[in-house]
């Protein structure tokens, strides 16, 4: 008994063989044409591969160029940063030296104006005389000291315009007959300022 499956397979093979024979009979050069088509396909694939490779090479070249440009810019920025840092360090050193020079000159200027006051105090102590003579010597020294302060543009803080917390320090509040409130009744210690800067506040009593 013949197996149906084997029979069907054999039938398919026979039919395919007849179709192939008919195709070759109608187109005797079919195999060559198929081969040519296959070669054309392979050639096209090679062309595509070559074009893709060229595109990748161009892209890689462009990337390398951009990378090199960025590296150069980075190096330029590093050099600029180093120069700025060096310039700032030099500027800081010059500024520190200038501040030190100004401070030294200011101290020297103050000492030059104060030393004569000390000289007069020493002379007053060295002279044998009466209390009145000593008083006159001290008064002269005070005047000289005040002249020195004036040359340094240091002035006494006034109390004529009433109590000012920016200029005066209230030690106590007192009642004073006939006096308006918030007036300076007494000065315990004079205050001084140079321009708008207070060097020492006046210590005062204030009326209620």
From Swiss-Prot:
Residues 1-38 are annotated as: Disordered. NCBIfam families: PRK14140.1, PRK14160.1. Residues 29-38 have a biased composition (Acidic residues). It holds the Pfam family GrpE. Coiled coil: none annotated. This is Protein GrpE. Its main location: cytoplasm. Belongs to the GrpE family. GO terms for cellular component: cytoplasm. It comes from the Bacteria. The gene is grpE. Residues 1-25 have a biased composition (Basic and acidic residues). The lineage of its organism: Bacteria, Bacillati, Bacillota, Clostridia, Eubacteriales. Homodimer. It comes from Clostridium perfringens (strain 13 / Type A). Participates actively in the response to hyperosmotic and heat shock by preventing the aggregation of stress-denatured proteins, in association with DnaK and GrpE. It is the nucleotide exchange factor for DnaK and may function as a thermosensor. Unfolded proteins bind initially to DnaJ; upon interaction with the DnaJ-bound protein, DnaK hydrolyzes its bound ATP, resulting in the formation of a stable complex. GrpE releases ADP from DnaK; ATP binding to DnaK triggers the release of the substrate protein, thus completing the reaction cycle. It is found in: Cytoplasm. One of its GO terms (biological process) is protein folding.
